[in-house]
């Protein structure tokens, strides 16, 4: 496994940790990045200033009671404050300062304390997809993926086909917003497959899956394989409906003063959602405000 030397050590100001009552467990917040580099993201030594930007940014929260998982995507073109660099697209933080600055930027934006960090390029998910025998998606229209013509409807995609599915952008009516949904679809499909194919109930299968993940994903040095296995076992009872995928509410798209195409976040809608994540109250927030956030359907397209 490739480990990233403590990416939290150089962050001057951290978001506060969640307060929990005696005997309770806090939520676990993992910042997951997908890079736009075609080189292996499992080798953190390959990071160089200005060389890579993040193609996907997701906060994955495992609730303290281990009954739900919430995944919140932040559009890569979101215009935010990058500490030490002024306003910029959030995906530039990784280019400017690697894992540490990215964590600092996300915590500064959301107020959510990040416990662990993971980074991969989406080619890394090819191996995970093939490890579990492919992923199921519903194609709205016939598509050619990785050289194979596929009809509309339910299809099982191998790793290369799933990669092509998530990289498509030009034909999508909402551009990057639809691409984010496809990235979420791929992740949901992997998780659903793992939950239903016996991986979590078989120590051998779980170890094999995590070993494949460890070869293709770089994590912070405190996130050991044993910790991953323990967290997976604690959530083995979850069903697909217990895992919610959402995207940070936005106010629209525009152009920055220097001519960049950007996404403007909706501060009024984002603040209570970020607070719910920070306090491990996502389930309650979504119940109380069912129209506040668009959730990816359990049956994904």
Can you name each region flagged by the protein language model?
Residues 1-66:
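Entry/capping segment at the start of metal-dependent catalytic domains
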Residues 4-15, 157, 218-301:
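C-terminal solvent-exposed extensions
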Residues 23-26, 35-36, 49-53, 67, ...:
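Solvent-exposed, acidic/flexible segments
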Residues 28, 124, 128-204, 208-210, ...:
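Flexible, polar/acidic helix-loop-strand segments at domain edges
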Residues 44-47, 88-96, 111-116, 170-177, ...:
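Second-shell loop/turn segments in exported
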Residues 54-56, 87, 91, 99-107, ...:
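Extracytoplasmic/secreted envelope proteins and their assembly/folding machinery
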Residues 61-64, 79, 95, 107-111, ...:
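Sec-exported extracytoplasmic/periplasmic mature domains
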